[in-house]
Amino acid sequence: MKKSIYILFVLLLLVSCSKNNNGYDALEKSLIGILEKKDYGYIMKNLNESAKAGNEDVYGLAYTYLAENGTAFFNEYMKKSKGIAEYYEALRLQETNGDEAQILGLLESAAKQGNIKAYYMIGNIYENKLEFTKAQEYLKKGRDAGEIYALYSYEYNKNLTNFYKRIEELNKKFNEGSITTEEKKELGTLVLEKVSNYEKAYDILKDFLSENFSPSLYAKAKLLEKDDKEEEAVEIYNQIFLQNKYYLAAFELASRLVKNQKDYNLALKVLDDTNSDEVLILGYKGFIYENLKDFVKAEEFYQKAISKNDIDSMNYLGRLYETKKDMKKAKNIYNKAYSLGSISAGYKLAYILEDEEKEKNPEKTEDSIKQSKEAKKILERLSNSGDDYSMVDLSLYYPETDKMVRILNLAAAAKLNTTAFYNLGVYYYNQKNKDKSKFYFRVAKENGYDIGEVFNAYITE
């Protein structure tokens, strides 16, 4: 399906699964201080203490707390943090529309110091500039270094090589002012459909609104959606669909029929009317058939999308196989998607591997510690990529009083993961630390986590 890059979310995922306890006491004091809204001086003292101890997780917490005011903190640790301070300062500049050359310079420095996440960032910047050849150079470096987001983007882009070459050709003409009207329409449509860059597509196509050119109207509708003008956007989607059954408009209408009305049959009719074989439509048809319990048709459409190398559809097909209890097929398709950089597939694959381990060694099923070495290896990689849910799950591979349970859940809690707050409550409960256990249970509960009757009673003692 269409590639969606959730920039802020992804870029914040820079947490190392450290094997030592350096700086975690100070990190925890900072976290508690932030949650309890303690004074700035206390929080900064502990953030600095954690950074000076070599803790790598503290920079993400500092970024969240300091936001646009983080320059002084990050500058202090440049050339001292394996490129992490440079990375977060680049992120801060990007969020505040800072100088692009400075951002790229910081990221290049971060990459040279071993921060492989910077390769993904640099590649993403060049993608947004429609310089895909350059983007792929950096994404390949990230892929080769084992960075999973770079791997996913590199593999995704590879499937669109011919389209991206054409975009680069047309964009050069556009920038030189030598592009024809038809070429301009082609460029804007490609940027819209293959890059999903609605702002840039609209800038290119806005001159064609007066002639009701479907891609230009669609780009306008997406920007209206972004401004919370849902009704106006849907009105345009209906207009475009009635006009020429434009597949992107059909998807927007079908997805709303499913989400708001659960009208799967009408949604399917809307998609059928487009006669489109785009992976977005094929994959969504599979999803609708799955909800209609027509698993044969669902698999057929997922496979059609997968034949076009759509990674998202691999995940959906894996879920379908799980529903059908065909775990061998689910495992195989998740493994394929994971090898192409899908974090969600890796997560699901780890669950299957753990279940297989339990079947092999039923005598260990009463042991609360998870056992699969293969699953643990996957979760370690995902944790190192910054996925907080994987950090929480990885902590289950250690004895409940092990220091890694605390470290992994602190790293996830710094991202405000509610399960991590609960797990820290349990950890300190087992350590007989009433103050901290009650604190974390309260935070978990305040953030919507069901801590259960026993711990609800415990925090009110």
Describe each PLM feature range.
Residues 61, 88, 121, 153, ...:
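Canonical tetratricopeptide repeat
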Residues 43, 70, 74, 103, ...:
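Single-residue signature of alpha-solenoid repeat helices
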Residues 53-56, 80-83, 113-115, 145-148, ...:
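Short helix-capping/linker turns of helical repeat alpha-solenoids
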Residues 94, 127, 159, 192-193, ...:
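Position-specific recognition of the canonical hydrophobic site in helix A of tetratricopeptide repeat
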Residues 15-16:
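C-terminal motif of bacterial Sec signal peptides marking the signal peptidase cleavage site
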Residues 37-38, 97-98, 130, 162, ...:
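Residue-level detector of the short coil/turn that links helix A to helix B
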Residues 31-32, 64, 91, 124, ...:
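Residue-level recognition of tetratricopeptide repeat
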